[in-house]
């Protein structure tokens, strides 16, 4: 008898998450030198991690025979101070994606519903369906921002979680403070609102969502060390929420979920504000470069407040494959319902120039 015959049907129906294509895999498949490949597919930090984080990893490496602090006391204390909240209002995970999973563990079941934007982080539907919940997509507005009135209309008595990605991924648009305030004034109490702010550092004027935590609302604010802080390979993210919400999430969390190297690196990275400043400045320069290049090429793009940009190329998957064959990895968007578009992460000036050179070749 096949094991699939008695497995959970909603798990069998899932499509596994597809990350940006790794450099090593591309090199193997195409016979390329890994050092000649430019990866602009996963919104990573092109400047790398903070040197202080690297030093912290080296100092901590000799202690990996000892279990880490399961409560991540020092890191959570630093996060609480940085965000202006209490220690008990913090939870850390192996990337903010683990905190998303904890939320789903705590709240979802086959009778529950989740509301999110049509073009949103693909882990939302994966995690929702993993727990058997119905996933309700709300189309974006004409300016590509979240339609929060549409979210309100989609909420039912069975809705348990609403995901608001701000800035959005893969689009890069931002919902403003007034729209969020209006939404929060109307959202029912039986709904947990999750503000996913993975790209917040790149936004010019990010709204204040932590005020809802301080007010004791049913919210979780998600942030990460994977993007602006350059620690994607260590998987460190966190959530800020009222203490009852955090207490619930900690009950679902696996013990020792954040290893010692990740904790020490994140602590050091959080203190290195100058590295984040340089990262944001590099991103702004890269964004200006791409916008000018697209303007000259006559391509449509969506102004982005993230560290990536969405551009319309007509045959997204084919352009992705053609660029891949030339050693430049971008991200096709057919999986997000945007088959004519590709997403390009902002790289170093040299990487950005190479990307545009190759894009011109394949179009």
Curated annotation (Swiss-Prot):
Its cofactor is pyridoxal 5'-phosphate. It catalyses: L-histidinol phosphate + 2-oxoglutarate = 3-(imidazol-4-yl)-2-oxopropyl phosphate + L-glutamate. It holds the Pfam family Aminotran_1_2. The modification N6-(pyridoxal phosphate)lysine is found at residue 227. Pathway: Amino-acid biosynthesis; L-histidine biosynthesis; L-histidine from 5-phospho-alpha-D-ribose 1-diphosphate: step 7/9. Its EC number is 2.6.1.9. One of its GO terms (biological process) is L-histidine biosynthetic process. InterPro entries: Aminotrans_II_pyridoxalP_BS, Aminotransferase_I/II_large, HisP_aminotrans, HistidinolP_aminotransfase, PyrdxlP-dep_Trfase, PyrdxlP-dep_Trfase_major, PyrdxlP-dep_Trfase_small. It is an enzyme of class 2 (transferase). The keyword Glycoprotein does not apply. One of its GO terms (molecular function) is histidinol-phosphate transaminase activity. Keywords: Amino-acid biosynthesis, Aminotransferase, Histidine biosynthesis, Pyridoxal phosphate, Transferase. Belongs to the class-II pyridoxal-phosphate-dependent aminotransferase family. Histidinol-phosphate aminotransferase subfamily. NCBIfam families: hisC. Homodimer. This is Histidinol-phosphate aminotransferase. The lineage of its organism: Bacteria, Pseudomonadati, Verrucomicrobiota, Verrucomicrobiia, Verrucomicrobiales.
């Amino acid at each position: 008898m096949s094991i699939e015959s008695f497995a959970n049907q909603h798990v069998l129906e899932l499509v596994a998450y597809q990350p940006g294509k790794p450099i090593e895999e591309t090199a193997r498949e195409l016979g390329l030198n890994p050092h000649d490949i430019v990866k602009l597919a996963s919104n990573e930090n092109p400047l790398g991690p903070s040197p202080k984080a690297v030093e912290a990893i080296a100092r901590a490496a000799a202690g990996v025979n000892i279990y880490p602090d399961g409560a991540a006391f020092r890191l959570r204390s630093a996060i609480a101070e940085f965000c202006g909240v209490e220690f008990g209002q913090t939870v850390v995970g192996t990337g903010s994606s683990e905190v998303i999973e904890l939320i789903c563990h705590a709240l979802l079941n086959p009778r529950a519903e989740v509301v999110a934007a049509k073009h949103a982080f693909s882990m939302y539907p994966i995690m929702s369906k993993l727990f058997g919940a119905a996933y309700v997509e709300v189309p974006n507005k004409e300016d590509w921002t979240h339609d929060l009135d549409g979210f309100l209309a989609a909420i039912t008595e069975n809705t348990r979680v609403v995901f608001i990605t701000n800035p959005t991924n893969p689009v890069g648009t931002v919902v403003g403070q007034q729209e969020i305030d209006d939404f929060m004034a109307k959202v029912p109490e039986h709904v947990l609102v999750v503000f996913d702010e993975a790209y917040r550092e790149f936004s010019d004027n990010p709204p204040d969502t932590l005020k809802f935590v301080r007010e004791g609302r049913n919210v979780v604010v998600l942030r990460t060390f994977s993007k602006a802080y350059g620690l994607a390979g260590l998987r460190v993210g966190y959530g800020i929420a009222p203490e009852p919400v955090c207490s619930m999430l900690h009950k679902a969390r696996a013990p020792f979920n954040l290893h010692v190297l990740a904790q020490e690196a994140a602590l050091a990275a959080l203190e290195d504000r100058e590295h984040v400043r340089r990262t944001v400045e590099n991103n702004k320069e890269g964004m200006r470069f791409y916008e000018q290049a697209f303007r000259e090429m006559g391509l449509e793009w969506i102004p982005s407040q993230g560290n990536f940009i969405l551009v319309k190329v007509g045959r997204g998957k084919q352009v992705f494959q053609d660029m891949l064959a030339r050693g430049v990895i971008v991200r096709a968007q057919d999986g997000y319902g945007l088959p004519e578009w590709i997403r390009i992460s902002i790289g170093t000036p040299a990487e950005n120039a190479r990307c545009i050179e190759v894009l011109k070749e394949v179009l």
